[in-house]
Amino acid sequence: MIISGSGLPLDLPKQTAGSNIKLIPIVSSARALNIIYRKWKQNYNKVPDAVVVEGPMAGGHLGFSFNDVLNNTAPTLEQLVKEVVDFVDTVEETIPVIAAGGIFDGNDIAKFLKLGASGVQMATRFVCTTECDVHDDFKQAYITAKKEDITIIHSPVGLPGRVILNEFTKRVTKGETIPFRCPHHCLRSCNPRTAPYCIAKVLADASKGRLNNAFVFAGSNAYRCTEIVSVKTLINQLKEELSNSL
């Protein structure tokens, strides 16, 4: 299974031709899914096996304009899920819709299931589990964060990103640069000659707890995490909340 974000993966079926790999694009609009659907079907006789609809409350890089995210003028996840579900209902194939971005508890899960989603994608909650393999300092950034610490930055790749405010974030926001060589060439939109720092290195350092020169990506509800629990405990809690909300 490949879950593909950061742009429209119009040629992805070409890369997996002859395999049974499931292809699941991440989109931020029904229009994006419409384009992917038509191109895949026309060129490869293939449609998405499912689709993740990611809204503006997600952590990390976001598929919306900086101002829309900052000013809360981007479409809500509720609006996006409804639009995508409506589009999927017009095609002959069955394409499960998975809601993502800011989903925190079983009540949220129930809300999106009622809107027609087949499931949800959650990341922030699972950072604060014992099984998550990031450094403990990364997890503690979630536990100690306040609501006002969750902020939006301009990422070097040209997208807004949601992070937890720390000293490194303040420094680079004020214009500090960290020279680097670019071994990755991960995105064309990132120019290593003008980028203030390497986002790939920053994220790798964050996962290892080197937060003096890194920041932590996090969803809009990260500040609501208060403890580290096992995945089993979290799943049981979500199931109970979901059951009570349906």
State the predicted function of each range.
Residues 1-91:
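Active-site entrance/lid segments in N-terminal catalytic domains of soluble metabolic enzymes
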Residues 57-77, 81-98, 104-246:
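Conserved active-site-proximal phosphate/metal-binding subdomains
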